[in-house]
């Protein structure tokens, strides 16, 4: 609709009404209560908005003389092509709108719904050109197979964004219907919708925020946005809210750490990649990306939190990953690894080629009695049970059991040197020559923990020249300051490449990495603390003696000046006392 001829004061009235009523109908009396402080002639305001196409008015059924009003969404021309920067800008606006009032997952839901709607409609247009003889319903059925089912064959109704965005009730019904039509792929999404409180947001004091979000997304066309752009936007949203959610206990692995692990475990075509603590799926997605363009790779994840597991599914979809090749199971992997039967269907052994994970650090409550709930505890936890204060080495054993080739695990650095039961398990891993490398990461990489983490690389197929040895990489200085979050650090592409290069070359580099014989580790009582074997070289600072002298001379003169001032004050005070 054209807004050029609408006076700013009437647009202000539009915003006031939108904030108060959203898309819900209201009467003249209701509008007057909201506008009377700013406008003398409310009737004129409503007429101007109606003339501009910003307000819809209909007669009451019981009394034709009285009108019912309803705000029309303020839309502009669609963005023809959404670049990554434009999409991130849109999401930043959305993030500013919701702040702490609305669950950030609503933003992810809207991104998902709008993106698949636009992609679906683009596919419909492509299919119409390809199959000119087919009627529209048959085209919709074909599109259902290509994207997700958004057309209800029985009800003969299409559930896409632009069909329902102007009606709150239809909007919620559409989301629920999409879940119903895609039960296997989107199982759990209905629960996510409930947990975000989205159905009630249209009815409470935050409804204007939700309506503004709908208007915001309605202005963008995602149909030609690549899945890389959409996936990056989804990841950006998770990353943007990570500092806040970390305070509430949610864990998010920085994407750079996931990239580094991909460079270390090197996922390839025709492999099954497992993450038994997959969170929102970011670690698995980075393995997929590393393997090339549209790789023939199967991603398998398990996540204890049901809502987070749904976020992983949406993440896969927006990255263009077919959910036939990406499965997420819900449950506690340490006690009930549900993924095994699926992996067995794919490759027979029930074990993955590569395993990657950032399991909860120092997770308590997983002692011998608890872990024996797992039917395969004798095989999985064959090296022993950790104490109840930290499940780190329970996770390492689980991952080792389900790994055929190589694994990359992010852990708290304390797992490398703590004693007791953990040391007993660690000793077995060292003696059996399962550990290929240990990488000490910089501090302040993780949102919920300032301490440095480590990456443990397990390799069941060590090359002959690496057998009986472990590579220690001290990457504690390999970081840049985080560009968006104060007090945090970040791995740059150069940092990642340097660490990956050191791992591939597997040789000593002064102050950075060292290849250590297992015998030396035994002498150190199986302590794997990276700093014990390699420390960064402290660079000598160049000192300009002339500059130092000038600075000292300056400070000395300032001292003398202030001394004379203070001395004068003291003499004055002394004179007054006498």
Curated annotation (Swiss-Prot):
<comment type="similarity">
    <text>Belongs to the N(4)/N(6)-methyltransferase family.</text>
</comment>
<keyword id="KW-0238">DNA-binding</keyword>
<comment type="function">
    <text>The subtype gamma methyltransferase (M) subunit of a type I restriction enzyme. In the presence of the R subunit the complex can also act as an endonuclease, binding to the same target sequence but cutting the DNA some distance from this site. Whether the DNA is cut or modified depends on the methylation state of the target sequence. When the target site is unmodified, the DNA is cut.</text>
</comment>
<dbReference type="GO" id="GO:0009307">
    <property type="term" value="P:DNA restriction-modification system"/>
</dbReference>
<feature type="binding site">
    <location>
        <begin position="280"/>
        <end position="282"/>
    </location>
    <ligand>
        <name>S-adenosyl-L-methionine</name>
    </ligand>
</feature>
<dbReference type="GO" id="GO:0003677">
    <property type="term" value="F:DNA binding"/>
</dbReference>
<dbReference type="GO" id="GO:0032259">
    <property type="term" value="P:methylation"/>
</dbReference>
<dbReference type="InterPro" id="IPR051537">
    <property type="entry name" value="DNA_Adenine_Mtase"/>
</dbReference>
<feature type="binding site">
    <location>
        <position position="303"/>
    </location>
    <ligand>
        <name>S-adenosyl-L-methionine</name>
    </ligand>
</feature>
<feature type="binding site">
    <location>
        <begin position="332"/>
        <end position="333"/>
    </location>
    <ligand>
        <name>S-adenosyl-L-methionine</name>
    </ligand>
</feature>
<keyword id="KW-0680">Restriction system</keyword>
<keyword id="KW-0489">Methyltransferase</keyword>
<dbReference type="InterPro" id="IPR002052">
    <property type="entry name" value="DNA_methylase_N6_adenine_CS"/>
</dbReference>
<dbReference type="InterPro" id="IPR029063">
    <property type="entry name" value="SAM-dependent_MTases_sf"/>
</dbReference>
<dbReference type="InterPro" id="IPR038333">
    <property type="entry name" value="T1MK-like_N_sf"/>
</dbReference>
<comment type="subunit">
    <text>The type I restriction/modification system is composed of three polypeptides R, M and S.</text>
</comment>
<protein>
    <recommendedName>
        <fullName>Type I restriction enzyme MjaVIII methylase subunit</fullName>
        <ecNumber>2.1.1.72</ecNumber>
    </recommendedName>
</protein>
<dbReference type="Pfam" id="PF02384">
    <property type="entry name" value="N6_Mtase"/>
</dbReference>
<keyword id="KW-0808">Transferase</keyword>
<dbReference type="GO" id="GO:0009007">
    <property type="term" value="F:site-specific DNA-methyltransferase (adenine-specific) activity"/>
</dbReference>
<feature type="binding site">
    <location>
        <begin position="250"/>
        <end position="255"/>
    </location>
    <ligand>
        <name>S-adenosyl-L-methionine</name>
    </ligand>
</feature>
<keyword id="KW-0949">S-adenosyl-L-methionine</keyword>
<dbReference type="InterPro" id="IPR003356">
    <property type="entry name" value="DNA_methylase_A-5"/>
</dbReference>
<dbReference type="GO" id="GO:0008170">
    <property type="term" value="F:N-methyltransferase activity"/>
</dbReference>
